[in-house]
Structures are given as structure tokens and as C-alpha cells.
């Protein structure tokens, strides 16, 4: 007997094309296309050494100075050499654009990253002038205690938020710190922000990555507390971190610059005199980038600038830094260069839909439509 043929159900008939979110606003740069070809992909390798406090010419380079503890909240004055700071670097990428007046430009887009803490095996050292388990006997204490691991890859400097345990702490000169911080510094104060623009200047204990910003940066971090916590670190060259967001776009390198940052504290080293200092390790990066065709100055950004100048937000307590707006779902367009502009004006809403602006007179057309409103 011949096998029966299963009939198609109505659920499998006439499948409609998949729909995606209608992206109205997503960052300040509009990606129009991804370039392909033998020279469209490049790889950058770099490493960042830890900035634990001790200078490069010190015998304890890679360590902080001996940790001091204040006896009173109002007398908290850490020394500069006992303050681990973020490591950062700006890597100049090959120049892609000779003419910056075009309506579209090429930009490097970071798509994936391989990174690893280097020197994990050095933590097995238990004999280099450290405190021993028993009096004059036994192995020395290995590096142990709190662990903080962080790295970031971005097309611009990492955005930071100041948040500190003791607002009355007096930081030394030479580090990026507030000398007269308000009480709100012990929680999230939207006014206390900065960008990581200097290597070894931003104390890790006071600055954190800003989750409300960093639209063009990907960051990752873990923390494990304690004084005797054993460090647990993985060694492998097979793990790849994808840097693309939910829209398939990675960090776009503005000005042909790639920004890297890291901080890797693996614990305390306890000396024979019971004094302790922190140990840091370097981090290796391998970044893959591809070329992307982008419009960094779309008309929607210009119109948004005009609107914000006429109707500014006048309250710093509004804890909104960046906004992404989605309006329902739509069919994926056959023309990937189709651009939608939606101009919101008090009491009115105007939608403009036309192909990619390949001629500059279209800028004038949209500006006229805005003026008519």
C-alpha cells in the first residue's frame, strides 16, 4: 500500500514575508549599506597593561601601593599610587574617506572581538616574598580576594558615571575625580558624568560605565567581592564576543578611531609584614572590523536639532539620556536605501518617505517641508 501524502494545512499556505520593527530613531548615525570585497574586513590586535598605581619604572609595576584605611569618614584621603584606574587606548584605523562633503561616507564598524586576560598562570606563584601559611613554614599565600574584570570596545570614548561610596573622600591631584562631590554622588546623579579620554586617570572605584549612554560602545564586566576569594579565570582563544546590537549594527568608529578600555584586578598580594596591595593583569584584544556606508548627518538629525533648540529640556532631573523609538512593525522593504523621516511638531505630524538622498537638493526639499509647517 502506497504511503499517504500529508496535505498542507492552511497554516503553511500563503506564508507572508517576515516583518521587522519599524525603526524610527536609532542612534545618531544611519547605516545605509555594508561594503563587501577583499579589503572590506580588517583585524586589529592590541593589548592594554594595567594601571594599578605603581609607575612603569617601579619594581612593583602591575601592583598598587600598600592599601591604607582611614579611621574616619571625613579623613578619607587615599594616595594616588593605591588607586587602580582604567586602561584605555585610541587606535587610529586606515583612513577611508578623502572627501567628507559627500552625502554618504565610509566608516569602520567593529563586528567581533576576541579578548583574554594575559598572565593568569602567574597567579600560581606562592614563593616570592609573601606571607606563609604557618610561621616560617608552608607555602606562601597566593593572590586572592576581590576580582574585577571589565573591557569595552567602541567607536568613541566610553561614557562614565560617577558613583562613590563616600562623597567626602578627598582624592589626590593627578586623577579624574570630583574634589567637592555632592551627597547625591553616593547614588545616581545625572550631572556627574564624563568620558574615558585618558589612560590611568579614572579611578575604578569611583567611575562606572554609564548604562544610559554608550550607544556606540559595547562593554562587559564582572565583579566578585571578598578578601580571600579565590580568583577564577578562564584561558582560551576560541571565544568570540559579537559586538552587533539587536539591529545588526556594531560600534561605528567616528573619525577612523577605535576605542578600547580595560580593568582587570585579580586580588590582593599579602606581604610578610601583613601589608596588602592589589594585583592587576593585562588584557589582549583582537578586533574584527568591516566597512560600512553611512550617513552621519541625516536630515532627521538636523530637524531634531532645530526642534530641541526651540523647545529645550530644562530639568536635569529627567533621567533620560538616549532614546530609541519603534512604531509597530513593517514589511522589510525591497529597497534597502529607503529612508523614512517623521517630523513631529506641536499638534502636527508629517511623514516623508523617499529613497536615499543621493542628491543634495533633496536636503533643500525637506527643509522647505519643515518651514511650511
Curated annotation (Swiss-Prot):
Gene Ontology terms describing biological process: caveolin-mediated endocytosis of virus by host cell; virion attachment to host cell
Record region (C-terminal arm): 299-373
Segments of skewed composition (Polar residues): 10-21
UniProt-recorded Gene Ontology molecular function terms: structural molecule activity
Main location: virion
Claim: Ligase is one of the keywords in the record: no
InterPro entries: Capsid_VP1_Polyomavir (IPR000662), dsDNA_vir_gr_I_capsid (IPR011222), Polyomavir_VP1_sf (IPR036931)
One GO term describing the cellular component: host cell nucleus
Keyword set, alphabetical order: Capsid protein, Caveolin-mediated endocytosis of virus by host, Disulfide bond, Host nucleus, Host-virus interaction, Late protein, Phosphoprotein, T=7 icosahedral capsid protein, Viral attachment to host cell, Viral penetration into host cytoplasm, Virion, Virus endocytosis by host, Virus entry into host cell
Region (Disordered): 1-21
Localization per record: Virion; Host nucleus
Family: Belongs to the polyomaviruses coat protein VP1 family.
Subunit: Homomultimer; disulfide-linked. The virus capsid is composed of 72 icosahedral units, each one composed of five disulfide-linked copies of VP1. Interacts with minor capsid proteins VP2 and VP3.
Notes concerning its domains: The intrinsically disordered C-terminal arm interacts with neighboring pentamers. The unstructured nature of this region allows to make different interactions depending on the structural context: pentamers present at the 12 icosahedral fivefold axes bind five pentamers, whereas pentamers present at the 60 icosahedral six-fold axes interact with six pentamers.
Note: The virus attaches to the surface of cells by recognition of oligosaccharides terminating in alpha(2,3)-linked sialic acid.
Function summary: Forms an icosahedral capsid with a T=7 symmetry and a 40 nm diameter. The capsid is composed of 72 pentamers linked to each other by disulfide bonds and associated with VP2 or VP3 proteins. Interacts with terminal alpha(2,3)-linked sialic acids on the cell surface to provide virion attachment to target cell. This attachment induces virion internalization predominantly through caveolin-mediated endocytosis. Once attached, the virion is internalized by caveolin-mediated endocytosis and traffics to the endoplasmic reticulum.
Name the record gives this protein: Major capsid protein VP1
Amino acid at each position: 500500500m502506497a504511503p499517504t501524502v500529508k496535505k498542507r494545512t492552511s497554516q503553511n499556505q500563503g506564508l507572508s514575508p517576515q516583518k521587522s520593527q519599524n525603526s524610527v530613531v536609532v542612534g545618531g548615525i544611519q547605516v545605509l549599506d555594508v561594503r563587501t570585497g577583499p579589503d572590506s574586513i580588517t583585524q586589529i590586535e592590541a593589548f592594554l597593561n594595567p594601571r594599578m598605581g605603581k609607575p612603569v619604572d617601579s619594581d612593583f609595576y602591575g601592583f598598587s601601593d600598600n592599601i591604607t584605611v582611614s579611621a574616619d569618614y571625613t579623613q578619607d584621603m587615599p594616595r594616588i599610587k593605591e588607586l587602580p584606574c582604567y586602561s584605555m587606548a585610541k587606535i587610529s584605523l586606515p583612513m577611508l574617506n578623502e572627501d567628507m562633503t559627500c552625502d554618504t561616507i565610509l566608516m569602520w564598524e567593529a563586528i567581533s572581538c576576541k579578548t583574554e586576560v594575559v598572565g593568569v598562570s602567574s597567579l600560581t606563584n606562592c614563593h616570592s616574598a609573601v606571607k606563609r601559611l604557618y610561621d616560617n613554614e608552608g607555602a606562601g599565600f597566593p593572590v586572592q580576594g576581590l576580582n574585577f574584570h571589565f573591557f569595552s570596545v567602541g567607536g568613541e570614548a566610553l561614557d562614565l558615571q560617577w558613583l562613590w561610596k563616600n562623597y567626602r573622600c578627598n582624592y589626590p591631584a593627578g586623577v579624574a575625580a570630583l574634589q567637592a562631590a555632592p551627597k547625591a554622588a553616593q547614588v545616581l546623579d545625572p550631572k556627574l558624568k564624563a568620558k574615558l579620554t585618558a589612560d590611568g586617570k579614572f579611578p575604578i572605584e569611583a567611575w562606572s560605565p554609564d548604562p544610559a549612554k554608550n550607544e556606540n560602545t559595547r562593554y562587559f564586566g564582572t565583579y566578585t567581592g571578598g578578601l580571600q576569594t579565590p580568583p577564577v579565570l578562564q584561558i582560551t582563544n576560541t571565544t568570540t564576543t559579537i559586538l552587533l546590537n539587536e539591529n545588526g549594527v556594531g560600534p561605528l568608529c567616528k573619525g577612523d578611531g577605535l576605542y578600547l578600555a580595560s580593568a582587570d584586578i585579580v586580588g590582593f598580594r599579602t606581604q610578610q609584614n601583613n601589608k596588602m596591595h592589589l594585583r592587576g593583569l593585562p588584557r589582549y584584544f583582537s578586533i574584527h572590523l568591516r566597512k560600512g556606508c553611512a550617513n552621519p548627518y541625516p536630515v532627521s538629525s538636523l530637524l531634531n536639532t532645530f526642534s530641541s533648540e526651540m523647545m529645550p529640556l530644562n530639568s536635569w532631573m529627567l533621567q533620560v539620556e538616549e532614546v530609541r523609538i519603534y512604531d509597530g512593525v513593517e514589511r522589510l522593504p525591497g529597497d534597502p536605501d529607503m529612508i523614512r523621516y517623521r517630523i513631529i511638531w506641536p499638534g502636527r505630524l508629517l511623514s516623508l518617505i523617499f529613497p536615499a538622498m543621493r542628491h543634495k537638493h533633496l536636503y533643500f526639499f525637506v527643509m522647505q517641508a519643515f518651514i511650511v509647517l
